[in-house]
């Protein structure tokens, strides 16, 4: 499984694996998954919502958000610690994932100024985050899925812990992480995935560790033992995830769009760091922005 697939799987893979397991485990699992997914459903109010018809197998986009609230008992709005745009195109049999740095310098609608990308969620939740990314990339953002930091921790614990191959020795939050294969519980996985200041690659190194944690979760979810613990997994998902995709939408994606998951292309919107008023940002030049915009437009069949 490619790194891109592992990122995509943290949000859809867990749900779809459980859904597809219904065939072998019967009506009770179907009912439990349905009820849990109903709890995650949360529509968004947008001035101009981009519509897509999943019944016609049209390409669609989804904004994937990892939110830095829910950990350590925090309940405030939080910010989007991770932002990924996913496009799913069954005709081309491809899913494209583009990561956007949290410090990307962007216009945030209604704020009258430019700011960090991850502040959009703090100012206006998923709706404003979707509007901000839609305006910045000049593509329609059809749906969103968000999961908070508590969700990551609870998912790791629900699957009984994970293993990752670590390539950097460092300490974070009282935990020591050494080079090689290491075992992580939920608290350790959270600390492992959040470190960036000791990493020579900064935020990009942090994103790499997030992908490794995702890989560990997905590997456990795909195992028989993890599926048998589906109640704990469903609880972690339903308590910590929000999306405007209904359970019926997820079923359509699982069954009608699976050809698009055979090829997953991963990309990163690359910026250059700069300081302004003592705050660090990432600025993306026009050539790089245009490159990514066109890549996503091609996948969504838009001009």
Curated annotation (Swiss-Prot):
What are the entry keywords?
Answer: Cell membrane, Cell wall biogenesis/degradation, Membrane, Signal-anchor, Transferase, Transmembrane, Transmembrane helix
Q: Can you cite a GO biological process for this protein? A: cell wall assembly
Which pathway?
A: Cell wall biogenesis
What EC number is given for this enzyme? 2.7.8.-
Q: Which residues lie on this side of the membrane: Cytoplasmic?
A: 1-6
Where is it mainly found? membrane
Topological domain ranges for the Extracellular compartment = 28-303
Read off the InterPro entries from this record.
LytR/CpsA/Psr_CW_biosynth, LytR_CpsA_psr, TagU
| Gene Ontology CC terms | plasma membrane
Q: Which residues cross the membrane?
A: 7-27
Q: Name one GO molecular function term.
A: phosphotransferase activity, for other substituted phosphate groups
Output the Pfam families linked to this UniProt entry: LytR_cpsA_psr
Q: Tell me the membrane topology, using the record's own terms.
A: Single-pass type II membrane protein
Instruction: Indicate where this protein resides in the cell.
Output: Cell membrane
Does Transport appear among the keywords?
no
Q: What task does this protein carry out?
A: May catalyze the final step in cell wall teichoic acid biosynthesis, the transfer of the anionic cell wall polymers (APs) from their lipid-linked precursor to the cell wall peptidoglycan (PG).
Belongs to which family? Belongs to the LytR/CpsA/Psr (LCP) family.
This chain's protein is named Polyisoprenyl-teichoic acid--peptidoglycan teichoic acid transferase TagU
Biological source species:
Enterococcus faecalis (strain ATCC 700802 / V583)
- State which gene encodes it: tagU
